[in-house]
Amino acid sequence: MQTNGLHHVTVVTHDIQRFYNFYNKVLGLKLLKETENIENTAMKNLYFGDNEGNAGTLLSVIEVANPLFVKYTTDEIYAYSLRVPTDYSLYVFKLRFDEMNIKYDTVIKLNGKHALPFYDCDGRCVYLISDEHNKGIPLGEPDDDSNVDAIHQILGLGPVLINASNRLLTSSILTQVLDLKHTSSYQLAAFDNDVQVFTSGDGGSGGEIHVVQGAASEKKRAANIEQVGVSVTEEVLFDYKKRLESVNIPHSEISDRKFYKTIFFKDPCGIVFELSTKPDFNL
């Protein structure tokens, strides 16, 4: 069995139109599908991704009734990143952010790759990460209708950063249950401890989950990151269900999320993971 890199990230927002305006008009992401929230059909669920709606490029946003004012804390998905083709693409987006008064910080490195931290419409810290020196899982397909030039478009998910109160517990889930490999570590200024890098599938930025054991922050934000999805084949999805049962990890049943099948579970620290199959947004 093996996982095949990142599949999607799910976030929540209380202002779905503002979210759409930011991610489509500012970042240039393609809206793949607008549908209803399965848990609350009065609320919307939007899917963004590359031109083909490929796994590894998907951002799912769920509308909620009220804004969530919570602190950055441990046992959460701290941030996610979005892949752009080159280092110069980061500069292009920096100019774009200046024009649109979008807050951003100085360029840093995530596992050796240049990344530009910025703050989205809900106050989340998101990283644009350069694919210039990346190897492994390839970028997705550009969208001809995007308002960002094809050579600079966001074409995939990059590393997802998890802040865990017990790094060993979350790490063991990644390696022993989901078959990721520990490949490296690096320093990130926001944390005292090293960030540990775990890799899925063919690796590279599109297959990385980064785990750090850090302290809670007093900084508040307006919405959170719900879960991270990892890609699997449909056959392997059933095998992972059996594995979760064998190690007594509570999990959902395999469910049909309209565009792909999925099973989700929480690790001992409360981080929500999904195992998801190849998407089809032509339904």
Cite the ranges covered by each PLM segment:
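Core segments of cupin and vicinal oxygen chelate
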Residues: V12-A55, V107-Y119, I162-G206
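Short, conserved charged micro-motifs
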Residues: Y88-V92, L168-S171, E235-Y240
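Conserved donor-binding loop and adjoining core beta-sheet/short helix segment
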Residues: K33-E36, F48-L82
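Short amphipathic alpha-helices in soluble, non-transmembrane regions
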Residues: K25, F93-F97, T175-Q176, K241-E245
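N-terminal beta-strand motif that seeds the catalytic metal site of vicinal oxygen chelate
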Residues: M1-R18, I77-L82, H133-S171, I225-V228, ...
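Intrinsically disordered, low-complexity segments enriched in Gly and acidic/Ser/Thr residues
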Residues: K220-D256
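Vicinal oxygen chelate
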Residues: T35, N45, Y91-G156, S184-H210, ...
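Short, structured motif recognition centered on aromatic/hydrophobic residues
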Residues: L6-V9, T13, L29, L59, ...
